[in-house]
Amino acid sequence: MSIIPTTFNEHAISYALAGGKNFKREENDVGAVIMSRGGWYNFPSIIKSLLDIGCTSIISVESPKKSIDLDNMIHEYPFVKFLLPQEKTTIGETINISISELKTNYVIVLWNDQSILDSKQLSKAIAEAKSLDKMCLSPVAITKTNDLISVQMLPILKQGHFSTEAIPIIQNNTRSIYAFDFAGIYTCNTFIDFGGFDYTITNPYWQNLDFGFRTFLWGEEIVINTHFKVKYLSMLPVEDTSHDDSYTRFYIKNLRPTVANGKAYMKFDVFFSYMKGMGFNPFMAYNYFKVGYDWVKKNQKRFTVPPYDLISNWREM
């Protein structure tokens, strides 16, 4: 049973960095992480948009499965560092690594199949990120056919079952329980202090939601900024919301802690309902429960709101 990380980037993986001869690392700078999913056709456009806003600390995360002309890319983009994982990693884990390498105050996370619609508006979003000091400002997004994507995510309970609902964004800096597709402007000090993404949760949907839920449980916020707009140039990613192993980890960490008198704790009777609800045998249920129990105890003073209060009062907050 993997132990839930309690510190940022706790899980060390093997990776290589290539290029970056003119890479600038300045603490007050805004860095960028370009995640790899589509082809290279949009890469020059993203780089131009980032340079237009003065971003010269850029990491491009490459897929081990994708063949690229690395020598040519290093020569053409000397201010970009190319991060090459040497083993299988989760999306969140590569973001953790990239943020630790950048060492900037703010980091823009994008995918290489996303186009930044307006660099000047992105500059406004960055200025708001600095003044608001939220965990993350996530972008408004449209499809390749210019249809608005519902990127505002609400936590909901239906007949006692937790899920999320996507609705269109209509107001600037509206809260969202997670940043759609991991994209956004992250405040790095807060991100690191909160532990980043949990590498033990391998399903991207639950990993992203785990980070977002923890953000709100611990008193911070993720909001959608209408100045920051991206366009998808390929098909939208499909979110896998199935109740898999990642869900069981998300559930015990985020939905079952009791919060009272300024701290969180796990009631032991949660074990029995957890075992029944997940269909586990006692041994397996105890292993999962113990990992969650220890993690909640370790972070008990960081919780600021009970999980179900957060959900039920979401629209009023």
Tell where the protein language model's regions lie, with residue ranges:
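Glycine-rich, basic loop-to-helix element that forms the pyrophosphate-binding segment
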Residues: P85-L102
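Short beta-strand-to-loop acidic/aromatic patch adjacent to the donor-nucleotide binding site
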Residues: N105-S115
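N-proximal low-complexity "stem/linker" segments adjacent to membrane-targeting elements
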Residues: M1-K48
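Active-site-adjacent helix/loop segment of glycosyltransferases
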Residues: I222-M317
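Acidic donor-binding segment of Leloir-type glycosyltransferases
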Residues: L50-L84
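A short, conserved alpha-helix in the catalytic core of glycosyltransferases
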Residues: Y178-A179, A183-G184, T190, F194, ...
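A recurrent flexible, glycine/aromatic-enriched loop bordering the glycosyltransferase active site
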Residues: A166-Y186
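Short beta-strand-to-loop element that shapes/binds the nucleotide-sugar donor at the catalytic cleft/hinge
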Residues: L137-M153
